[in-house]
Amino acid sequence: DEQRIASDFFCGDAAKALPGLVVAACIGKNPLMIYAGQELGERGMDAEGFSGKDGRTTIFDYWSPETLRKLATLPELLEEVKQSQLLNAEELRLYEAYHTILRLRETSPALREGAFFDVMYVNYQSISGFDPNRHYAFLRKTTDEAILAVANFSDQGISVGVKLPAHAFDYLHLAEGTFAARDLMSGRKTDIVLTRDGETSVQVPANSAVLLSFCP
């Protein structure tokens, strides 16, 4: 069993899983598994009888992680969860983020059923701040919605240029131009400029992602 992202043996911070969650949840139409207690930041730092304190939730002992006990008592609706005061501030922020991302898989046509195009192959030698070791970008598109997704795995907020190859425009039937976009993660509105083999300017918070949705 793998060590938890939030454990002292790995990242020590459950929020650092969010950019990876966005990529895993939004890159395709496949089912997604949320590891037990992950949405509340399970740390795997209990000292279970057989496994011991190893950053993992044991698969050998009869054990009850606190995060799973909390999840079992939460109301079904997010607003009721907020009002219940069953979660501390950090847990609630994380739970809301997971709720938002997982709901988007169902409510966004592009994420639910859209075509996928990976743009990383043209961004490995960026001169506009895009770091392929810490940033990841891709496109999803249906007839009525397109999404430019950019994940930031670094501890610093970024303002970078994401290059979009001409082949992406041909494959996805994208038009060039300036589009009014909305980040599905934050609700923030912005304009994005799309040109064949050109760069699109994007701002992404630390350890987070943007899902810039626009009408193609």
Where are the predicted features?
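Loop/helix patches that line or flank the sugar-binding groove of alpha-linked glycan CAZymes
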Residues: 4-178
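C-terminal beta-strand-rich structural cap/linker in extracellular carbohydrate-active enzymes
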Residues: 192-216
